[in-house]
Amino acid sequence: MTDDLALFRRRLLRNPRQVSAIAPSSRTLARAMTLGLGPKSGKVVEFGPGTGRFTEAILARGVRPEDLTLFELDEEFVAHLRARFPGVTVHQRPAQEAVDLVGSDVGTVVSGLPLLSMPTEVREGIIDAAFQILAPRGRFVQFTYGSRPPLPPEIITAQGLTVNKGHKVWANLPPATVYRFRRA
């Protein structure tokens, strides 16, 4: 864990806009983000895994490594994830390219990306990719630090999504709220 924190801090100092967090996500937030996942969840895709806090929680819930695919841009995070999670597929590619690399039968997309701080066209490309790879009843899980949903109302409406807002996770720096989105 100390290695994860050291890596996180090093990458934050080198590229704060890409890391876009002041601390790694807590284990409590990771459990909240992965609630409902298990051995029968099917394929799971994670966008922006960083040091792998959510990845660790996904696997702890019983998702098989061969059913988990990660998309991470940072070269050092990718090397760390590949070493730490053998059997998990790790792509050093943007989340928008998931459509070309993953089938359209994914049960859950877990996102650690800072969607609200991204340019609109990037955010929309990521959301489009997520819902193109999700199975019809698949869900997109995203957290936010703020008081509003991590997807703007126009995207929720355009994608025809239902929204499930979870409780605030106070045991995270800063506190975060988990949202689950599905097509209606």
Could you say what each language-model-derived stretch is?
Residues 3-37:
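Class I SAM-dependent methyltransferase Rossmann-like catalytic core
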Residues 124-136:
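A short glycine-rich, Lys/Arg-flanked "PGG" loop and its adjoining helix->strand segment in the class I
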Residues 87-96:
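Conserved SAM-binding strand-loop segment of SAM-dependent methyltransferases
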Residues 51-63:
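Conserved SAM-binding loop of SAM-dependent methyltransferases across substrates and taxa
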Residues 99-109:
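A short acidic, Gly/Pro-enriched loop at the edge of an enzyme's catalytic core
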Residues 74-76:
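Conserved SAM/SAH-binding beta-strand->alpha-helix loop
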Residues 41-50:
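Conserved class I S-adenosyl-L-methionine
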